[in-house]
Amino acid sequence: MAKFMCTHTLPAGKFSSEQLRQFAQAAQQDATVKGYRSFANLAEGRAVCVMEAQNKDEVAAWFQKMGMPFDTITKVELEGERGNIHAA
């Protein structure tokens, strides 16, 4: 599966940490997409996550099914950590 970097603008006060936890857990149970990593700042209404799926359309369909707003879904070509960059 490919990795997709997703950005979200969350309506202020609409999402709690528990709701985001439920989204993350649901992504682990789905047959089409898998959650890989998430970052969020609820006070500023911003979140970024990395999802694994066969294609961008599967990720978009999953977000729509779950009622999770999203701004962008971008296929990850390179990833890195602590100065090491490699193909995704």
Label for each model-derived stretch:
Residues 1-32, 41-45, 56, 78-88:
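Short S/T/G/P-rich N-terminal loop/turn motif that feeds into the first structured element of a domain
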Residues 37-38:
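Hydrophobic/aromatic beta-strand elements that line small-molecule binding cavities or substrate pockets
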